[in-house]
From Swiss-Prot:
Protein's gene: tatB
Top-level division of the source organism's lineage: Bacteria
UniProt region (Disordered), positions on chain: 96-131
One annotated Gene Ontology cellular component of this protein: TAT protein transport complex
GO terms for MF: protein transmembrane transporter activity
Subunit structure: The Tat system comprises two distinct complexes: a TatABC complex, containing multiple copies of TatA, TatB and TatC subunits, and a separate TatA complex, containing only TatA subunits. Substrates initially bind to the TatABC complex, which probably triggers association of the separate TatA complex to form the active translocon.
Biological role stated in the UniProt entry: Part of the twin-arginine translocation (Tat) system that transports large folded proteins containing a characteristic twin-arginine motif in their signal peptide across membranes. Together with TatC, TatB is part of a receptor directly interacting with Tat signal peptides. TatB may form an oligomeric binding site that transiently accommodates folded Tat precursor proteins before their translocation.
Entry protein name: Sec-independent protein translocase protein TatB
InterPro entries: TatA/B/E, TatB
Keyword terms: Cell membrane, Membrane, Protein transport, Translocation, Transmembrane, Transmembrane helix, Transport
Amino acid sequence: MLGSLSWEHMLVLVVVGLVVLGPERLPGAIRWTSNALRQARDYLSGVTTQLREDLGPEFDDLRVPLSELQKLRGMTPRAALTKHLLDGDDSFLTGAFDRPVNGAAAQPPPAPAPPPEPHRSGQTPFDADAT
């Protein structure tokens, strides 16, 4: 739950807590929060243990589809399309249809340089209605 918080974020939270709660109430608030998180973790581990006891070996069978679903949720649409419809070959999506021969990388043609903008002499056009 708090795995994505870095030490810098935690320091900012402590400083904000110190400003909002004050130095007298901050240790009690930290203690209360840690106890609440510990109780929630114990409750969730108890629920997991109870499910394991109630379902028995079917619990592990239930975990396999759930882990596959979790993998699919993390995929981008392009990765899902590549994996399931194209069997991992993404050359259709990337445009790299021809494989390089003997491991030699094909060099793309250099991009054409944009034509230089012609220098205009004279007065700059002015539109009184546009300004």
